[in-house]
Structure formats: structure tokens, C-alpha cells
From Swiss-Prot:
It is found in: Cell inner membrane. Its EC number is 2.4.2.-, 2.4.2.22. 5-phospho-alpha-D-ribose 1-diphosphate binds at residues 37-38, 69, 88-96. Transmembrane segments: none annotated. Guanine binds at residues 92, 135. It catalyses: GMP + diphosphate = guanine + 5-phospho-alpha-D-ribose 1-diphosphate; XMP + diphosphate = xanthine + 5-phospho-alpha-D-ribose 1-diphosphate; IMP + diphosphate = hypoxanthine + 5-phospho-alpha-D-ribose 1-diphosphate. This is Xanthine-guanine phosphoribosyltransferase. One of its GO terms (biological process) is IMP salvage. Pathway: Purine metabolism; GMP biosynthesis via salvage pathway; GMP from guanine: step 1/1; Purine metabolism; XMP biosynthesis via salvage pathway; XMP from xanthine: step 1/1. Its cofactor is Mg(2+). Purine salvage pathway enzyme that catalyzes the transfer of the ribosyl-5-phosphate group from 5-phospho-alpha-D-ribose 1-diphosphate (PRPP) to the N9 position of the 6-oxopurines guanine and xanthine to form the corresponding ribonucleotides GMP (guanosine 5'-monophosphate) and XMP (xanthosine 5'-monophosphate), with the release of PPi. To a lesser extent, also acts on hypoxanthine. Keywords: Cell inner membrane, Cell membrane, Glycosyltransferase, Magnesium, Membrane, Metal-binding, Purine salvage, Transferase.
Length: 152
């Protein structure tokens, strides 16, 4: 990845709220299935905004920090996804998204961020991200002191 896109907590909450507005009315949804781990925080934010209490997870491992590797399904929510929102933080190459579509063909699949290769696989997203850009999510960072350039 040549570029980095840094996401703050404030930005994430604003984007999640925008996505939640598009998912109204909330009564049409039985629940949310969050893709672990990237979709856990967006899933919680959507659940809050939409007043949804039924939240489940599907646990798919496909990243090791900034390296993609073979996909492994660790745990899945039951059913075909009918009436459920499946949420992940981003769709990148589409590997995870294809697995989600196979597992939950009737779900409404959403992400906060979408890269071009995976964009056609989601039903909705908020922000376009170039394919060669790595997204630094707020849960992967911490605030630290940065000394002034002058050293004074």
C-alpha cells in the first residue's frame, strides 16, 4: 500500500450516522451481523443509531495487520441473512465480501469504506477509498505526543 488514510473516532461516528440514515426505517431490520473484527465498532454504532438490540457476529480472519492472507471462517451467525444488515468497516479486494455474500445471500451488506475492487459487492457504503490506500482505523491507533519540528 502506498498511501495511508487515517480515520479518527469523530470521522467514524459521522460516517456511521450517515450510513444509519440510509438504513431507515429501522423496523425493517431483524438485527445486525457485524463482521469481526473490523465491523464490530461500526456494528455497535449502527445498532445505537437504529435502536437495534439483536446484534450477532460472523468471525472471518483475512488480514494480519496490513497483509492479506488466506480466509478462515471462525464463527458464523445462523441463517441466510434475511432481514439483517451485515456490516464491515471496509470492502477491499472483495475476498471477505464474497464469503459474506455466499453465507448471507439475503442480507443487506454495508460498509463504511469501499475500494474499487470490492465496491460492486456491497449494497451501500459511505466513503470511496483508492485501491492502493491502507486505512488506519481509530481502534488500531492511540494519541501520542509529537514533539515540535524545531525541537524547542
Amino acid at each position: 500500500m502506498s498511501e495511508k488514510y487515517v480515520v479518527t473516532w469523530d470521522m467514524l461516528q459521522i460516517h456511521a450516522r450517515k450510513l444509519a440514515q440510509r438504513l431507515l426505517p429501522a423496523e425493517q431490520w431483524k438485527g445486525i451481523i457485524a463482521v469481526s473484527r473490523g465491523g464490530l465498532v461500526p456494528g455497535a454504532l449502527l445498532a445505537r443509531e437504529l435502536g437495534i438490540r439483536h446484534v450477532d457476529t460472523v468471525c472471518i480472519s483475512s488480514y494480519d495487520h496490513d497483509n492479506q492472507r488466506e480466509m478462515k471462517v471462525i464463527k458464523r451467525a445462523e441463517g441466510d441473512g434475511e432481514g439483517f444488515i451485515v456490516v464491515d468497516d471496509l470492502v477491499d479486494t472483495g475476498g471477505t465480501a464474497k464469503a459474506i455474500r455466499d453465507m448471507y445471500p439475503k442480507a443487506h451488506f454495508v460498509t463504511i469504506f469501499a475500494k474499487p475492487a470490492g465496491q460492486p459487492l456491497v449494497d451501500d457504503y459511505v466513503i470511496d477509498i483508492p485501491q492502493d490506500t491502507w486505512i488506519e482505523q481509530p481502534w488500531d491507533m492511540c494519541v501520542v505526543f509529537v514533539p515540535p519540528l524545531s525541537g524547542r
